[in-house]
């Protein structure tokens, strides 16, 4: 059912090179399964691949079984949008339920990390376990795919056997931070059609085509939480243990609702302020004392208690799968959309690294990922174990 429509896009023609007949013929031998989320990025990705001559089919993944509050998880609406786009593009849409895999390999880890006082990033684990493992294996083994494709804003360079992962061209939308666990082999089996263009161009192509997703709002947050309050959601699965809020000097200034609800560097939602004998500078979460169930806060954004000179990271993944065994100069992000931090990686062993920043950094958070770059290339990363003060 490849490209049975006569759809065209002037915006596409302006931003993508015209392929030779030989290249189109070569691509026509390859089958690509696009992960269709019901959003604009995957919709346009499918169209781009059709224009490049590939045999294109879509696959919609359901990764969460809705609870009784179906307003929060929009799987049914997203499926309807994905189907409408598939119909418009004249391509087949497969459906698969990965909810069991998601629960076992992503959600249970998410809960365990929060229970241990860390702040995990389930999007990274979802990409690792679902989109580039369960989906990739299903597409290759059951659907006969040569490649999968997603709407991620990243780029790949090099041949299939030695593919490198690069930042997306649109620096505001770059998602390489979430894909650092991929191996060069997985990158080589994947295509990222929108990684070489900017988001406004993606929307313009969708507008040209009259796609139902053209003006659809980007999804925010995690499907299983959606737009609901995070605290209410987490309380359904983990019992909260309220406790004291203390300053770094040990003064009790309030009560917290449970350490799992707070993250390092957090300012809002602490419920403290205007304390007698203290200045008006806001408080920030500096530390979580798990042993005593105490939330430790520091006053002022530039308070030294909030700063780290480096970090220790484990659970390492390098895109080329070669461990780093010598000190390496590069840059690092310790959270999404952060400006790159110049640093040095100092390997401790193949499973552990020490990272020293050129300048102290605020809110380095255990459980989050440290992702490393040299220029445009994403080297890989690891999970932050501890700060180095």
UniProtKB/Swiss-Prot annotation:
Disulfide bonds join 126-223. The active site is at residues 126, 223. GO terms for biological process: tRNA wobble position uridine thiolation. One of its GO terms (cellular component) is cytoplasm. Residues 121-123 are annotated as: Interaction with target base in tRNA. The keyword Transmembrane does not apply. Belongs to the MnmA/TRMU family. The keyword ATP-binding applies. This is tRNA-specific 2-thiouridylase MnmA.
């Amino acid at each position: 059912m490849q490209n049975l429509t006569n759809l065209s896009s002037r915006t596409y023609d302006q931003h993508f090179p015209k392929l030779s007949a030989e290249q189109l013929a070569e691509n026509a031998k390859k089958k690509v399964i696009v992960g269709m989320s019901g959003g604009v990025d995957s919709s346009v990705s499918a169209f781009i691949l059709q224009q490049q001559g590939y045999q294109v089919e879509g696959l919609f993944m359901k990764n969460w079984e809705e609870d009784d509050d179906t307003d929060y998880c929009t799987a049914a609406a997203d499926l309807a949008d994905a189907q409408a786009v598939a119909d418009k593009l004249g391509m087949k849409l497969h459906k698969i339920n990965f909810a069991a895999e998601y629960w076992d390999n992503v959600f249970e880890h998410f809960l365990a990390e929060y229970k241990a006082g860390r702040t995990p990033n389930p999007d990274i684990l979802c990409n690792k376990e679902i989109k580039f493992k369960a989906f990739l294996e299903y597409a290759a083994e059951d659907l006969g795919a040569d490649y999968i494709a997603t709407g991620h804003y990243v780029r790949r360079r090099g041949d299939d056997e030695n593919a490198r992962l690069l930042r997306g061209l649109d620096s505001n939308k770059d998602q390489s931070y979430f894909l650092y666990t991929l191996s060069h082999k997985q990158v080589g089996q994947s295509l990222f059609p929108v990684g070489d263009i900017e988001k406004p161009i993606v929307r313009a192509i969708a507008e040209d085509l009259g796609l139902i997703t053209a003006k659809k709002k980007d999804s925010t947050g995690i499907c299983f939480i959606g737009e609901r309050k995070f605290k209410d959601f987490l309380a359904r699965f983990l019992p909260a243990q309220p406790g004291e809020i203390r300053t770094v000097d040990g003064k009790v200034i309030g009560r917290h609702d449970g350490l799992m609800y707070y993250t390092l560097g957090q300012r809002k939602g602490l419920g403290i302020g205007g304390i007698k004998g203290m200045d008006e500078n806001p408080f920030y979460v500096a530390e979580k004392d798990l042993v005593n169930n105490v939330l430790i806060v520091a006053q002022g954004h530039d308070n030294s208690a909030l700063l780290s000179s480096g970090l220790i990271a484990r659970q390492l993944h390098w895109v080329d799968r070669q461990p780093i065994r010598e000190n390496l100069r590069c840059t690092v992000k310790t959270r999404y959309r952060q400006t790159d931090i110049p640093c040095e990686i100092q390997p401790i062993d193949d499973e552990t690294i020490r990272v020293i920043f050129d300048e102290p950094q605020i809110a380095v958070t255990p459980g989050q990922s440290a992702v490393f770059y040299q220029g445009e290339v994403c080297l890989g990363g690891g999970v932050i174990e501890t700060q180095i003060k």
